[in-house]
Amino acid sequence: MKAVTGKRLAKLAESKGWELARIKGSHHIYVKEGRIERVVIPIHGNKTLKIGLQRSLMKIIPVAEGDL
């Protein structure tokens, strides 16, 4: 799996219809109408996300590996 930054995953979430609800520190919180879950994406400059967090967020959004 290709490593991805929080900034890149946030852009992909927005392209899938998720809206930025608020920002608390470096954590961007996204919501989508009709969904109960929130997506919290940590954006720490150009640091890549850890693999477990990346997989979890990709399942919720949903994003395919080919979209990265």
Where do the PLM segments sit?
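Short beta-strand
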Residues: L20-I23
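Histidine-centered active-site/metal-ligand motif
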Residues: H27-H28, H44
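Active-site beta-strand termini and strand-to-loop segments that position acidic
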Residues: V31-G34
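Recognition helix of helix-turn-helix/homeodomain-like DNA-binding domains
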Residues: V39-I43
